[in-house]
Amino acid sequence: MEMKLELVPIPVTDVDHAKTFYVERLGFVEDVDVQPAAGVRVVQLTPAGSACSIGMGTGLPAYDEMAPGTIKGLHLVVADIEQACAELVGRGVEVGAVEDVGGGVKYAWLADPDGNTLTLQEMSWRTGDKF
């Protein structure tokens, strides 16, 4: 059986503010922003080159029952972490120092406006279509 990870819900306090951060600061692509029913909003954003998206919204248990800021360490894999950090800093994102943990693996951390944390990850041996 084959399965694909499609969506990771991200709990936020203000959908518009979070959407702006992910699209304008992190460069995610807006795939969906719909209000399919009264009191329900679904926003789906995808990092460029990724098959998996993040979701945020209101009026659904996946969004309303999780406390904002509780997602920790969602990994964003990049080919060149120094370049990615420089680009994000240039867009006004606070990014922690790059940490080389050995074995060709490097990490850097950042947070969205609600305190959900994201981890930039570079694995020098995992490039191209493999990451």
What are these regions (language model features)?
Residues 26, 38, 68, 72, ...:
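Short glycine-rich loop/turn motifs that provide flexible caps or phosphate-binding loops at active sites
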Residues 14-15, 79-82:
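Helix N-cap motif at beta-to-alpha junctions
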Residues 29-69, 117-124:
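Conserved short beta-strand elements that form part of the metal-binding/catalytic scaffold
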Residues 10, 74-79:
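Short, well-ordered beta-strand elements within core beta-sheets of diverse protein domains
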Residues 2-3, 10-52, 90:
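Core segments of cupin and vicinal oxygen chelate
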Residues 21, 82-87:
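Short amphipathic alpha-helices within nucleic acid-binding modules
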Residues 3, 7, 32-34, 41-44, ...:
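Vicinal oxygen chelate
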